[in-house]
């Protein structure tokens, strides 16, 4: 049984790609058809590739992998943070800072600064400082928290990265490739799948689609760490794989 059923994929709109004029030809193997100027992703392939991604992440998690979730656009930011935290992992959900991984030591100095400011407040230092200085410290902390708060406790460079929309996160993908970090990603029809190690062809612009796939990656981590019973909603609804391509086309066309 698939970890996500065909019905769930359809209901979340995972099959809707971009306008045909915006496509990346390298995504052709994952495209089922074209309707009204929009590419339709082949959900039979997505269903199988989600399973592959789930197993890949689960197996990595069993080995104690550190997983970094990345998704900085508004449709992804909330799900990326929520699911990373649920899985006990780390995230970047605002702008990716160039060198976030390739200049890891420099980023760590900013992490140290964030922790210093938090410690100052915890120890009561804020109470004896001038109000103007406290305001400045809070502004600095807010900015640091926004950009690096999700990796402040990450013990090392990640072993695996999960990325929503590698087309938008090209800098993150490039840094992962430079460091040899495998990338699992939701890849829409406008993106280049070649740099991605584990491709999940999917609509990366719909909040429901992003939430569905991202939650399954979190489930995979939880299952890998704690066993099958710990993963929420691990068993998908009865798979609708028997639906023929013709039936899928009818659903897409709204017949």
UniProtKB/Swiss-Prot annotation:
Q: Which Gene3D superfamilies match?
A: Glucose-6-phosphate isomerase like protein, domain 1, Helix hairpin bin
What's the protein here called?
A: Small ribosomal subunit protein uS2
Q: Where is this region: Disordered?
A: 233-255
Similarity field? Belongs to the universal ribosomal protein uS2 family.
Origin species, per record, is: Lactococcus lactis subsp. cremoris (strain SK11)
Q: Which InterPro entries match?
A: Ribosomal_uS2 (IPR001865), Ribosomal_uS2_bac/mit/plastid (IPR005706), Ribosomal_uS2_CS (IPR018130), Ribosomal_uS2_flav_dom_sf (IPR023591)
Q: Name one GO biological process term.
A: translation
PANTHER family recorded: 30S RIBOSOMAL PROTEIN S2 PROKARYOTIC AND ORGANELLAR, SMALL RIBOSOMAL SUBUNIT PROTEIN US2M
What keywords does the record list, in alphabetical order?
A: Ribonucleoprotein, Ribosomal protein
* Disulfide pairings: none
